[in-house]
């Protein structure tokens, strides 16, 4: 079992129960899923770019990504409906906890000029979204084999009812928020 999951069950739950005055363990917010999304707009011209992005996402997450397609045609972007324009992975369970641990302890500190993550990126329901400009912050990516530096969106979906609960949950995991 992932060490972050053990930490959540052993320490974070009791800490959050005291902080918010919950009566039951089931009321405590928990991380439900983590979604990684990589938009590859240049895939319109070169399909190989999407394959490389999918390979990067597979290496990072340990799971085969779903190819996302354009929902509608946009002439300005030269996109037609149904064109493959990105890929995404939804992590749950054990893989989610392993990825979350690597994200907090290894990947985020490797971000260039890192001064902490914005605490304003909550959506109003306790879910946190962040953007990463380079996929090379993850140790699974071999720097020499990268054809192009790509960014990705990382969304951490929680069962928290408010942003304060979500922020407290992530802070319990030592999530590096900007002061």
Curated annotation (Swiss-Prot):
Biological-process GO terms, alphabetical: translation
The protein's role, per its UniProt record: This is one of the proteins that bind and probably mediate the attachment of the 5S RNA into the large ribosomal subunit, where it forms part of the central protuberance. In the 70S ribosome it contacts protein S13 of the 30S subunit (bridge B1b), connecting the 2 subunits; this bridge is implicated in subunit movement. Contacts the P site tRNA; the 5S rRNA and some of its associated proteins might help stabilize positioning of ribosome-bound tRNAs.
Subunit and interaction comment: Part of the 50S ribosomal subunit; part of the 5S rRNA/L5/L18/L25 subcomplex. Contacts the 5S rRNA and the P site tRNA. Forms a bridge to the 30S subunit in the 70S ribosome.
Gene3D superfamilies associated with the record: 3.30.1440.10
Keyword Amino-acid biosynthesis assigned: no
InterPro entries: Ribosomal_uL5, Ribosomal_uL5_bac-type, Ribosomal_uL5_C, Ribosomal_uL5_CS, Ribosomal_uL5_dom_sf, Ribosomal_uL5_N
Pfam families: Ribosomal_L5, Ribosomal_L5_C
Gene name for this UniProt entry: rplE
Listed NCBIfam families: PRK00010.1
Organism of this sequence: Sodalis glossinidius (strain morsitans)
GO MF annotations in UniProt: rRNA binding; structural constituent of ribosome; tRNA binding
A cellular-component GO term for this protein: ribonucleoprotein complex
Similarity comment: Belongs to the universal ribosomal protein uL5 family.
Entry keywords, A to Z: Ribonucleoprotein, Ribosomal protein, RNA-binding, rRNA-binding, tRNA-binding
UniProt name for this protein: Large ribosomal subunit protein uL5
């Amino acid at each position: 079992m992932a060490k972050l999951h053990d930490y959540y069950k052993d320490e974070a739950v009791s800490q959050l129960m005291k902080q918010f005055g919950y009566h039951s363990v089931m009321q405590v917010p928990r991380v439900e899923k983590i979604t990684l999304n990589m938009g590859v707009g240049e895939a319109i011209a070169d399909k190989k770019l999407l394959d490389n992005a999918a390979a990067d996402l597979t290496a990072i997450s340990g799971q085969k990504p779903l190819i996302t397609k354009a929902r509608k045609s946009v002439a300005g972007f030269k996109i037609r409906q149904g064109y493959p324009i990105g890929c995404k992975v939804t992590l749950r369970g054990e893989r989610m906890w392993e990825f979350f641990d690597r994200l907090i302890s290894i990947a985020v500190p490797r971000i260039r000029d890192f001064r902490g993550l914005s605490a304003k990126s909550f959506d109003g329901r306790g879910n946190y979204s962040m953007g990463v400009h380079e996929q090379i912050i993850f140790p699974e990516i071999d720097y020499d084999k990268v054809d192009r530096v790509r960014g990705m969106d990382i969304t951490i979906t929680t069962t928290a009812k408010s942003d304060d609960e979500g922020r407290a949950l992530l802070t319990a995991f030592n999530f590096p928020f900007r002061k």
